Each structure stands twice: as structure tokens, then as C-alpha cells.
From Swiss-Prot:
Record organism: Chlamydia trachomatis serovar D (strain ATCC VR-885 / DSM 19411 / UW-3/Cx)
Subcellular location: Secreted; Host vacuole, Host pathogen-containing vacuole, Host pathogen-containing vacuole membrane
GO CC terms, sorted: extracellular region; host cell membrane; pathogen-containing vacuole membrane
InterPro entries according to UniProt: IncD (IPR035117)
Function summary: Inclusion membrane protein probably involved in early modification events of the chlamydial inclusion.
Domain of life: Bacteria
Topology versus the membrane: Multi-pass membrane protein
Pfam family, one: IncD
Gene: incD
Listed name of the protein: Inclusion membrane protein D
Transmembrane region(s): 38-58, 68-88
Length: 141
């Protein structure tokens, strides 16, 4: 009797794990993270580029405006392009990491399904044994 109860508790835990894995495997759950990452990266690029341009423009106003203005635009555009390359690298790394995570979760899912099938087989075997024991008891009485 206690084995059947323990098996039902184990089966409930397996069902909870399956539900958790289904939520993890849902690709729509990872989209907000990528969107937030893009927004933060673009804001950082713009802030760095604008700070470089503003600093150089301020020094250009104090010194010689034409040459420093050209330099500030050059450095601002350079900072923006460098930031864009950095963000591209970060997003590529994030996409690869998410893909690897999804693949490992899929493997975990397959492993869990195999374990669940084994648990269900053990439970059905235990219930069949319990039924046969009940039949033998009835015959013995």
C-alpha cells in the first residue's frame, strides 16, 4: 500500500517537472530578455556616442570649431559603429547561448520522458501485482 502511495507521489513530482520543462522550452519566454538586451545596448551606444560628440563639441567651441567639429563627428560615428559591432557580438553570443540552452532542455525533456515512461511502467506493474495479490487472497479465503 505504501509503495503505491510513494509511486503516486513520485508520479506527481514527474508531472510537475514536465510542466516546468514545458514552460522552459517555450521559446516565447525568452523573447522579452532579447528585446530588453537590444534596448539597453542601443541606449548605451547612443549615450556613449553622444557623450563623445558633446565633449568634443564643447572642446571645439573653446578651441577651433571647424577641425574639432569634424573630429567630433568622426569620433562619434566611430564610437557608434564600434558600439554596434559590440552589440552585434553580444546578441550573437546571446542567440547561440539560448540555442544551446534550448537544445540541452530538449535533451533533458527526452530524458525525463524516458524516466516518466519507466515510472509509469513500474506503477502499472505494481498495480498489476497488487491486483494479482488481491485475486490470490480472494481465492485463499
Amino acid at each position: 500500500m505504501t509503495k503505491v502511495y510513494a509511486n503516486s507521489i513520485q508520479q506527481e513530482r514527474v508531472v510537475d517537472r514536465i510542466a516546468l520543462l514545458e514552460r522552459c522550452l517555450d521559446p516565447s519566454n525568452s523573447l522579452p530578455t532579447a528585446k530588453r538586451l537590444v534596448a539597453v545596448a542601443v541606449a548605451t551606444i547612443l549615450a556613449v556616442a553622444l557623450l563623445v560628440v558633446a565633449g568634443l563639441l564643447f572642446s571645439g567651441v573653446l578651441c577651433s570649431p571647424v577641425s574639432v567639429l569634424a573630429a567630433s563627428l568622426f569620433f562619434g560615428v566611430g564610437a557608434f559603429l564600434l558600439g554596434g559591432a559590440l552589440v552585434g557580438g553580444v546578441l550573437t553570443t546571446e542567440a547561440v547561448t539560448r540555442e544551446r540552452l534550448h537544445r540541452s532542455q530538449t535533451l533533458m525533456w527526452n530524458n525525463l520522458c524516458c524516466k516518466t515512461a519507466e515510472v509509469e511502467q513500474k506503477i502499472s506493474t505494481a498495480s498489476a501485482n497488487a491486483k494479482s495479490n488481491d485475486k490470490t487472497r480472494k481465492l485463499g479465503e
